[in-house]
């Protein structure tokens, strides 16, 4: 199989996990909050990498990787791609804050500029297995961008802490 074909398969089946590579995102300075710049070869990969960054910032696993015990299907809408990304991340944060659901993997099964549907696999927060690294209060619109770049796509997001 050629490298391009392997890459296409990886993107098609891409999921994020808590061993998510920090090479897909980096932090930028922002007063009193956390700024994250995230990259993806496709918009779908960008969204999954951004979700991975959210949970990498929030959760520390004391006992290894997340064990997939629960599944959820979510549908999110937005007025444009940036709004869709913010709403997607807000839904993940809502599931964590409201149901203590830690998303361990994410498969985006439907995606357009204004709507996405994703299948989430994860587990409930457990003090014996997890700790909170950083409490994120909200995903903000302040400075949020999603744009095409030479290597694919880039987003800048600010997490209110």
Regions found by a protein language model. Name each.
Residues 23-40, 44, 49-161:
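N-terminal intrinsically disordered, cationic/polar leader segments
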Residues 2-11:
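Extreme N-terminal basic, low-complexity initiation segments
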